[in-house]
Amino acid sequence: MERIVIALAIINIVKGDQICIGYHANNSTEQVDTIMEKNVTVTHAQDILEKEHNGKLCSLKGVRPLILKDCSVAGWLLGNPMCDEFLNVPEWSYIVEKDNPVNGLCYPGDFNDYEELKHLMSSTNHFEKIQIIPRNSWSTHDASSGVSSACPYNGRSSFFRNVVWLIKKNNAYPTIKRTYNNTNVEDLLILWGIHHPNDAAEQTKLYQNSNTYVSVGTSTLNQRSIPEIATRPKVNGQSGRMEFFWTILRPNDAISFESNGNFIAPEYAYKIVKKGDSAIMKSELEYGNCDTKCQTPVGAINSSMPFHNVHPLTIGECPKYVKSDKLVLATGLRNVPQRETRGLFGAIAGFIEGGWQGMVDGWYGYHHSNEQGSGYAADKESTQKAIDGITNKVNSIIDKMNTQFEAVGKEFNNLERRIENLNKKMEDGFLDVWTYNAELLVLMENERTLDFHDSNVKNLYDKVRLQLRDNAKELGNGCFEFYHKCDNECMESVRNGTYDYPQYSEESRLNREEIDGVKLESMGTYQILSIYSTVASSLALAIMVAGLSFWMCSNGSLQCRICI
């Protein structure tokens, strides 16, 4: 009877009022990496790496791109007859050129400093074409016969629209001396060229003079070109070649031309009426009737994320390109769902063995159990502080990294391959550094966030422990067991920090002494039972061994000899 009373007393002790400190858990499968661990499941996370694009060319902040279709930049600026739709173009946000446009220099040749011109256009948003030397002003030269079958239009020979190929007139080619003064307030882009005939006969046929030159001068330019007559293979049916040049004429500056043959004269020039961020982007896409803040050659990105892995070349206000496949910031806690089959207290409660899916209105909080029932209650103050802190941190990271960032392709000619290779290696190096920095940033911040949550739970636990002191027992799993009755009002006082320790200290002391006495008595009883059980077991074993030996001796299976 005494042992039954002891057992009931122990059961009664186990079922005392309890309060546990724990944290939120949910069904999330989001995983993050930290400095110390990989694939940590968390309750909440935020992806900061954009991986999607729309596969279209879009307007940039409401301004359409200039999509050159099958025309090159050279074909557009010189006026290839197949590019007539681009003779006058509105303002553009960026220029799109195919990798290998078919309508470029229809008459074979070269565009001097072409890559530098493309670089210049990365800071231009609008040209206004103006006439600087009218075609009909060449009274002593033939300004209409300079056409070629290499530049056809409607089945007939034609030529670049914006320059004039001057031919001899009446078997004479008088020396040209022309000057144009830039009275505009804007810079002017001026283009001209020189023709290199196939042989001396062609030279005389076209220009009459055999020793010719083209001289061009401004306040900053002094250039003299001489035709190079040579036999060449035919390109587009032509053995001759043309070489084109360009310069920027500043306001109040003048450009002078002098030539006695082979001159490709400018008729139109381009007034640079608007400068700004632009680019020449290589892409085969068509316009998608859309708007974006960030464009890549493979499609537009509409994202507020600080990083992307869509394409290394961009134009606009873009995230930074990194080579990473995953950049996820932890914003919630470690997600360790409770083990429902093991009961609530002592197995799943607290921050040691698992979180609570039943607590949905906060990150940290309490679970209590008393005679009035049980329930969850979030600690909203600590939760809100944590949410504010993490939100501010994430926003700060995004604001710092999500600045306008453009990475446009650089142009190199055939003689600059070593420079191009070096540039690619440098850019790859920068991308590697950016990628490493981004990944390290995420790993460190995730480690700090999870440590921050662990610290907040521990602080909440310490807050309760300091209030209860010896009025309750720590169960070692995030729970406290009261030595006194604690109704719902008492539980609320623990949660809000107003628990009255003296009010319950006497009751706790008496119950604690009673429990300690019961434990001592039960310990003595169990010790006696343990000794009795050990002696009885040993005696029974000895009797069994003796009986077995006697039986084996009697049937001859075991020989027994007693020597004196």
Curated annotation (Swiss-Prot):
State the function annotated in the UniProt record: Binds to sialic acid-containing receptors on the cell surface, bringing about the attachment of the virus particle to the cell. This attachment induces virion internalization of about two third of the virus particles through clathrin-dependent endocytosis and about one third through a clathrin- and caveolin-independent pathway. Plays a major role in the determination of host range restriction and virulence. Class I viral fusion protein.
Annotated lipid attachment (S-palmitoyl cysteine): 553, 560, 563
Q: Which family is annotated?
A: Belongs to the influenza viruses hemagglutinin family.
InterPro entries assigned: Capsid_hemagglutn, Hemagglutn_HA1_a/b_dom_sf, Hemagglutn_influenz_A, Hemagglutn_influenz_A/B
Q: Could you describe the subunit structure of this protein? A: Homotrimer of disulfide-linked HA1-HA2.
Q: What is its main location?
A: virion
- What is this protein's name? Hemagglutinin
Other noteworthy facts: Major glycoprotein, comprises over 80% of the envelope proteins present in virus particle.
Q: How does it sit in the membrane?
A: Single-pass type I membrane protein
Which segment of the chain is annotated as a signal peptide? 1-16
